[in-house]
């Protein structure tokens, strides 16, 4: 390798942390645009009137954000989660979060009829359930309420720190 190429590559590698930081910042901005929609879908799927604690009370929207924002999470799935929420809002003319319970059910059923919508709802359901029943150290399943509702508890030994922080 010639000296000039070495210096160019060295400079590019030195900039990598800043390039990554820009991506994370843009993701946070994008998530803020659709976070309310995702939270509303999660709350509709797991409402407060069921045996299982509500998605809202368990903090699963924050769990979803932290999970898909992690650097090891698949970028395509991350984009899929955001784009799916944007598509749902587009189909509902930006008013999904304002719809009644019955209208949300109708909108989600219609969205589920599309292949894209079916896959998106499945992904949201999966991540939401991961949050509802994960070890509370990961920020959801507050007070182990998900485990209590199922009369099941996490394995032993319990995590002492978040896996993503190791």
Please give the residue ranges for each predicted region:
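Generic hydrophobic alpha-helical segments
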Residues: 13-14, 48, 131
